[in-house]
Amino acid sequence: MPDEFQIDAALTPAPQPSQGRNESNDAALTEDLALAQLKDPDLSSDVFEQLYRNDSVMKSRKVRMAMASHQRTPRRIALRIVRELYTFELMQFALKPTAAADLKRIADELLLSRLSSITLGERISLARRSSTLVAEGLLLDKEPQVWQRALENARLTEAAIVKALRRPTGTRGFVEAVSHHPKWSVRYEVQVALLRNAHTPLAKALEFARRIPPRQLRDILHVSRLPERIKSQLRKEREVSGE
């Protein structure tokens, strides 16, 4: 299975565009002209309405993306377009700096809802390049190739790692990988989350426990899902060290 997929080749079918639009009288309008118009930051709502009614230009993925991410696009139009975007178009849209924050959130949620129906290769590609929210969701994928790529996503945050570690659906392989990861395993909050996780290896749990103040460690172990034998070992080591 290839590690990356070209966007055009990896498009996943989405709902078909709305049939409510009619052919515009402006048959001369081309993709290039529409894109040129959409570069105007002060475009009027009437122009967006005219463009949206033009079935010919709305077949263009570039035009749809430009309209959805334009700051002046009427929200009802932008929302309809977002709901019609293909999988990798949703990923691109969610990373657009000009797109409205609430619409980017919707795009992320649509992507998350499709994860169970897209291919392994597409999930691998998304894991490397998607937004923080989608990368966080892919940390819980059952396939190691997916969550391994998500761990290297440049947009992934410490908070996302901690949230994933708190979920009971995380795999043993994922937890062990985080506990050995050169970037994430040294983060204090990640270490605390690992000490609460049932799958953290004993050797790493001992290593992290040594860095936690005794009182806080007791509180962590009180709610930890680690096996009792490991928790007993951690407590015993603290007693031996006189802490």
Where are these regions (language model features)?
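Alpha-helical scaffold segments
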Residues: M1-E243
